[in-house]
């Protein structure tokens, strides 16, 4: 019998997120100088920081490459930022091998075809509400939120609540 997503959430030690369509809504604002700007959700950032402070691994694997994104993620305390990844499966395997993380301990949130193969390797493949149909079909949990609109916060909060760690933030013990 297959485990429920909440049973799987109890095993999660590591969160891996794509950027475009997950941490952002997938839009790119092009400035007159050609610079591409993305908008990220503050609540998603709070949740990633809370996860790190609670001992979870947080990793970013993205095909995109934007220095502003890297700076934002570094400022949140994320050290494992893999932008311009030509093959997300290879990056995932290198990351999990380096830190000796079992794939079943990983929650991966992706939104589109480039995430498909890596999502098939993890314990808990998840996606935003507005992910592509192919990604929704393989996800064990589909957020009620769209990409860039709190989907990351939702899955982190869900895992931390299942593992009885979210209350530390809710009660102000991590100010």
Which residues are covered by each model-predicted region?
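Mg2+-dependent phosphoryl-transfer enzymes with acidic/Ser/Thr/Gly-rich catalytic loops
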Residues: 34-38, 75-76, 80-82, 89-175
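Substrate-recognition element of Asp-dependent hydrolases with the DxDx(T/V) motif
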Residues: 48-72, 83
